[in-house]
């Protein structure tokens, strides 16, 4: 029996081993097949994802050389400090001082009282005190303080500055008739990623929601655009688009950059990152009418409004406008933009380093980063413009005329009111701007040369803090600006650009709706120094992908 059993084992054992080996082979074969299927699925999913989202972008290096001058002026902050100090002296002694030195001696001997006075001072108290002085006394006071506030003009050059800009674009077909578009952007100067500049009176030294990637800021990649568009609503040529809008780089500003139209509104009126809604209707193959809404300041979140009584809270700042491509095809664009901004505030939420207290005029000795929150609604502002842009063979050209009108409330703050100084009663003013340019393309479309010129009047103002100019938005100038440039394609999607811009400012306050414009050759009183002329040479190299 044992022999039979042993023989059986000898017979079965190889079969068992063979069967086990066969099972392992099958399992291994199955695993290989699963891996192959998994790879195919991953490839399909990757392809599907790539089909859903299309990525692109560009990187730009720029080198800038700036030669600028500041004209003779009276330092408004120093003058403000002198007024406040004199108020303290007058309140304690009942008489005007004989000299600024007498005020300083009095402050030194009563410094504790002086600190209490300046810390508790309000702008309304300051205005009331100034209004209580008879004109003769005001003149006497100014004659005493002005000499100490005088500043000789000086150069404000920057021989060489470099910047990096990275933009990543994405588009997706979400569903039938629904699309998504977005753009992330980073823009910085070499050697700085602080994201906050020391305020120097220029609009590009104040970081707000409207210009976070429009002026050099930091190495932070920010959301410049993110919006969906719902087309063919109810079977009509009607669409709805909501989100952070494509509101920068609009025509004709794209021409001088050698780019396609980058934004919807006219770029010489609105070049401002904002969140909003557009309802559009295609009137025909070559005409689109758009109704646009946006919010520039949200009062009810993040500003401590709950801590205030309802009567003391600010209104939201909104705008509503019409943007009509009257006719648009490959060779012609006739466009008009009309808009009103409601309840404009004395600035927008942002981060800032203030060198001086705008109420007391006293210097802020430490570079303190602070959140700036508006303190008042100042009124409404109307803007309107017409643009004709043409392509005739190798020559592109455009004509553009714009208009602005203020509707102020009788409100001022330490920064002023709509087109008025802090101690004035604001009045309605209007301004205008005209702009023309041309570009010639040759060398088998590899090279372009262009010339542009624009002029802004005394009360000209537009919403262009994100305009792609390193020195200042050129279309915001209250004066004359001339630009010449050359763009050459070095390789496919690789470009070099050399540009020169000359600014000749006539009035102060370009880019600002606050403060009264002042003739710059009249030794004006300025809250902050401003340029009267500047020349900017810029070399750019851009890789698009």
What are these regions (language model features)?
Residues 1-2:
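N-terminal secretory signal peptides that target proteins for export/translocation
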Residues 5-11, 18-158, 169, 545:
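N-terminal periplasmic/intermembrane-space "pro-region" immediately following the signal or transit peptide
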Residues 21-25, 67-68, 151-155, 336-545:
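Outer-membrane beta-barrel pore domains
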Residues 60-81, 182-195, 343-348, 454, ...:
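Short, solvent-exposed beta-strand-terminating loops
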Residues 114-165, 207-218, 367-377, 420-426, ...:
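Intrinsically disordered, low-complexity acidic Ser/Thr-rich regulatory segments
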Residues 156-301, 320-334, 430-465:
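Outer membrane beta-barrel
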Residues 271-276, 318-319, 323-325, 472-487:
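Outer-membrane beta-barrel signature, preferentially recognizing the C-terminal barrel domain
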